[in-house]
Amino acid sequence: MQTKKINLLEKRTFSDELTVTFQFIKQEFKSLIKAFSAIVLPLIFVELFLQSFLLRDILGGAARNAFADGGSGWTTMLVNYLLAIFVFAWLQLFVLSYLRLYTDKYLQQEEIKISFLELLKVMGRNSGLFFVLGIVYLFYVVMGCVIFILPGIYISVIFIFSSCFLIIRDRKLFSAFASSADLCRGQWWNTFGYILLCSLIVSMLGYVFNLPYLGIFLEAYLTGNQPGLFELTLVNSVGTIGRYLMNIVFIVGIGVRFFSRLERKEHRTLLDKIGQIGTEERTESGEDGV
């Protein structure tokens, strides 16, 4: 059974990294969805609950007053925006912790069965530093964009693997940034293209979850009837949950590239195989001597 599992620590080409991303999602689908439902979905429900207040104001015709002269609508929108950032960060922490446990068990040749408690333990151990890293990362990117748009894009790419180093390799804050920049050295355009392609694929797949929106507003246009709060809340829930599910694909894709680039740099799997060959030869020599 173990040999059928995907080894993430392998050197792969650009196209192979994308292929393995979807193969890994397919392989771990049930386990990922169960863990996602227990660890991430409750926070998404909180976000949806807060979003329902904005929808209610819009349908009730109170949106103009709520946003006029510093009304409560701006506060509600800001809270929703900050919560969405937090939920995405929590999702990223969840997926990277899953990849950490998966690779650890694979390398140790254990049965790859990841429990909720194992995930929560890894997430809890790294959550504080992870959120600090996220704040520093956003600060770097925003400052780069303030100076000029291109520096912001450049910084966002070279530090894209910093969270991977933090969670998967137990690097400290600035060591994670330095390691990410080193891993991207000479590969900036390639990495940028990979991130862009992953984003486009995930966005295209995400449109499937937005089809209910199109249906509701098309019906409203044809009939002249305003959508009800229940209908809008329902399609908003489907779209939001679908968006986060698609983000799992994106984060796994970044993780697959991280492992591929890391293997090119460290040759860890190759060294392990050489070590296993040496162990087998010593074992055979001992048996011959007996």
Predicted regions and their residues:
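Hydrophobic alpha-helical transmembrane segments of multi-pass membrane proteins
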Residues: 78-86, 143-150, 163, 237-245
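Juxtamembrane transition segments at transmembrane-helix termini in multipass membrane proteins
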Residues: 1-8, 20, 57-69, 91, ...
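Hydrophobic alpha-helical transmembrane bundles that constitute the permease/transmembrane domains
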Residues: 44, 48, 134-135, 207, ...
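Alpha-helical transmembrane segments of multi-pass membrane proteins
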Residues: 41-56
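Hydrophobic alpha-helical transmembrane segments of multi-pass integral membrane proteins
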Residues: 37-45, 87, 91
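Interfacial aromatic "cap" segments that immediately flank transmembrane helices
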Residues: 15-42, 116-143, 157-205
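A conserved helix-loop-strand patch within extracytoplasmic ligand-binding domains
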Residues: 69-82, 96-99, 104, 109, ...
